[in-house]
Curated annotation (Swiss-Prot):
Belongs to the universal ribosomal protein uS19 family. It comes from the Eukaryota. Keywords: Chloroplast, Plastid, Ribonucleoprotein, Ribosomal protein, RNA-binding, rRNA-binding. It is found in: Plastid, Chloroplast. HAMAP family: Ribosomal_uS19. Pfam families: Ribosomal_S19. One of its GO terms (cellular component) is mitochondrial small ribosomal subunit. The keyword Calcium does not apply. Disulfide bonds: none annotated. Its main location: plastid. This is Small ribosomal subunit protein uS19c. Protein S19 forms a complex with S13 that binds strongly to the 16S ribosomal RNA. Transmembrane segments: none annotated.
Length: 92
């Protein structure tokens, strides 16, 4: 179910403050965050945000096509290592 249109998109306060501060200074630094549930808003375009995936922070450059999506969508938490091998030879 999607978020109600009456509500504003969720962005963590600390993340929003960091983005606004960098926009005021016109700096481009990497912003480190654990807030995967924050929505990408237009003021974040052009910044690099390091999103935590449970093990490390992955730097993601924010473009205009990402607006409206959540930060966690761009930092996968699982690594697929392949299906289990079918070991019929060793069972004989």
């Amino acid at each position: 179910m999607t978020r109600s249109l009456k509500k504003n998109p969720f962005v963590a306060n600390h993340l929003l403050e960091k983005v606004e501060k960098l926009n005021m200074r016109e700096e481009k630094k990497i912003i480190v965050t654990w807030s995967r549930s924050s929505t990408i808003i237009p003021t974040m375009i052009g910044h690099t945000i390091a999103i935590h995936n449970g093990r490390e922070h992955l730097p993601i450059y924010i473009t205009d096509r990402m607006v409206g999506h959540k930060l966690g969508e761009f930092a996968p938490t699982l690594t697929f290592r392949g299906h289990a091998r079918n070991d019929n030879r060793s069972r004989r």
